[in-house]
């Protein structure tokens, strides 16, 4: 869906949909709930989005673009920050359960069979993020391997799973420091 342009009202529905899917999941939130929460009628919803599947696709594309903007701001425009601190900011941004990556992470598990386009959006973001992490690792260590970037991505996702199962926030920090020590 290149050049996604939405009317203001439709964009408000997308923002609310992102919030609903973030907390309720893709299968538990139906069109009726979206319509009720956003106070648009079903006809308007289907006029804007045509189906729940397309609505989910649009929500994930919007979320992916927002997150990519945040990542680019960290790695490209923050010139006063060291590479290690940039990697740490990326790690913290992506392991925040209230943050934008959580929805894309959730989509990997919940959309593969039912919403394949949405699943592909989440997978494409993971690939893009791996490349961004790799470019930062190369600045840190010339002989860094692409697998190092994948390991950090797996650590991000492992930290999310750990946070979902417990309240050990300090473990997240310790895990990142372990990665840096192993890289050195």
Protein language model regions, located:
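Hydrophobic/aromatic-rich alpha-helical bundle segments in the mid-to-C-terminal region
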Residues: 106, 138-181
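Alpha-helical DNA-contacting segments of helix-turn-helix folds
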Residues: 56-63, 70
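Helix-turn-helix
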Residues: 12, 20-54, 58
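N-terminal intrinsically disordered/low-complexity leader segments
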Residues: 1-8
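Amphipathic alpha-helical packing segments from all-alpha helical-bundle domains
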Residues: 65, 69-72, 115-150, 177
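Secondary-structure edge/capping motif, primarily at the C-terminal ends of alpha-helices
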Residues: 71-78, 105-112, 163-167
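Amphipathic alpha-helical segments used for helix-helix packing
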Residues: 95-117
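Hydrophobic alpha-helical connector segments
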Residues: 58, 72-99, 152
